[in-house]
Amino acid sequence: LFARGVARRYALWRSGRPQARFDRPLLRLRGLLVEVFGGRRQLRDPLAGSAHLLILYGFCAELVATSLISIQDWSGVHFLEGRFYLGYSLFADLFGIAGLIGVGMAAWRRAFLRPAHLHTVFDDWLALALLGLVFAQGFAIEGVRIAVTELEAQPGLALWSPGGYAVAVLLRPLPDATLLLLHRTLWWVHALTAFGFIGYVAYGKLEHIAYGLANVFTRNLA
């Protein structure tokens, strides 16, 4: 679905007149990083901008964290160990918490503050729900794992994952067999949610994740 959506948008772009929009790639990349991660435009509205940046940083950090796990599993090279693993765990959890806070701020703004210029439709709530689910499911899976493998056997290690640790404390009274079944179930639910999220990005409210980056990179530098 994602590839199909991107292909359709690319065909639309190709229908226009050709222009040089890939020249000076380093300048374009620098502008992209400043615009996206600096949040200059978004922070004109402090609450909306802060929520956007928290979600962005949280999402990017979780993407990096998940990618590192995948690289380790596929390569067979175990580099998530020792102090690096502790830092990695803390980094992933803190940014995941930041992402959840950002989703909460955005939802609060739409549900209760309701600025006059802000028009909320179903797609807005769907986007926030998907983002919140992706973050929350990650903590749920981590919490189940910690409850089984670290909470009692390695409590010092578990503390480096504060979000997962909080979930683990709540779940620890459950039998190990129940926790293992819950872990497998949550893993598949999370995988389906993540793939659904990726497909949704090409069509829904979050399409700016893909197309906004392309638009900023290929902006007119004249």
Predicted segments, located by residue:
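Membrane-embedded alpha-helical bundles of multi-pass integral membrane proteins
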Residues: L1-A222
